[in-house]
Amino acid sequence: MSVLGELDLLGPRAHGAACGEAVLKAVAEDFQVDEVLEIPLSGEGEHLWLWVEKRGLNTEEAARRLGRAAGVQQKNVSYAGLKDRQALTRQWFSLHLPGKADPDLGAAEGADLRILRCTRHSRKLQRGAHAANGFTLRLTGLRAERAPLDARLERIAADGVPNYFGLQRFGHGGGNLVDARSCAEQDLLPANRNLRSRFLSAGRSYLFNRLLAERVAEGSWNRAAVGDLLAFTDSRSFFLAGEEECRDARLAALDLHPTGPLWGEGDPPSGAGVLDRELALAGREPALCRWLAKAGMAHERRILRLPIQGLAWHYPEPDVLQLEFVLPAGCFATVVVREILDLVPTGQTENPCAY
């Protein structure tokens, strides 16, 4: 099986060649993620919400440990999104405990998992319920000239970056996409729910990345065209762009963005030449598109441009760059880093990342 690389799975950079190189994730503390949840918790109800810190542990394993310790089935453990294994992450989980007292969760805790807070709420935590993720990244072994590096950081803070799905979505060497293609060609869906979700996500993400790569290559990823579907940063709704919408000041302010397709049933609802481009993509990947539609995936949209909120940086040591920023839920910190630096292999992970 051929191994798929970064350009196969993502696409070209928008801001030019990397300014240098560094190591990310030499240790878990080099990649810290804090889930941002904008839900007021009532303090009462049949769902126990847990604010959990984990190190070197993926979200699914943390959920299994919490479920075992609480004595509940896995279907009664919920979380908003997956977080990277090779990282220090803090995120919410909820346990459905109707008519039950708070359980002793000590058996779930250890050096790699700590429960920082517990509270009750009337509803379970839904997938995708978090508003954003806050990142603190420590890039070590830095080899780059300071002036062009600072200039690049200022540029991406002002202009954003292409909102690619990161390599983590596709598995080691693109293995999840290879498996998705195999399923599509055989018209099969895995019986295992986690595998099914992983393969469908990989196929859908690949199609989006291919469309975004085309627009990055021609320089239109951050500009609205007539026929584009536009969306605000934190909204899943979208509207068709005419000439007036293409002049909306909120595009320049990075509040409003052109979108690309997350493939599902039916043709994309885009218009004019944008629809032609998206249908041409479907024509190059007919099996994958049919498979996604048959799986019952609804056609959705994703913003092409990723605004970076609160980007700050400093150099705690001459060869260390520390970045802090916030991204909308579902977006990848690694696609921000790739517009700045090349990552050397040491310390990189093959495990699912924050989304």
UniProtKB/Swiss-Prot annotation:
UniProt keyword list: Isomerase, tRNA processing
Active-site residues per Swiss-Prot or TrEMBL entry: 84
EC identifiers of the protein: 5.4.99.27
GO CC entries: cytosol
Highest taxon of the lineage: Bacteria
One GO process term, biological-process aspect: tRNA pseudouridine synthesis
Reactions that this protein is recorded to catalyse: uridine(13) in tRNA = pseudouridine(13) in tRNA
Ribosomal protein among keywords: no
Enzyme class: isomerase
Ranges for domain TRUD: 160-306
Pfam families cross-referenced by the UniProt entry: TruD
MF GO annotations: pseudouridine synthase activity; RNA binding; tRNA pseudouridine(13) synthase activity
PANTHER family listed in its UniProt record: TRNA PSEUDOURIDINE SYNTHASE D
Record-stated family: Belongs to the pseudouridine synthase TruD family.
Function recorded in the entry: Responsible for synthesis of pseudouridine from uracil-13 in transfer RNAs.
Protein name per Swiss-Prot or TrEMBL: tRNA pseudouridine synthase D
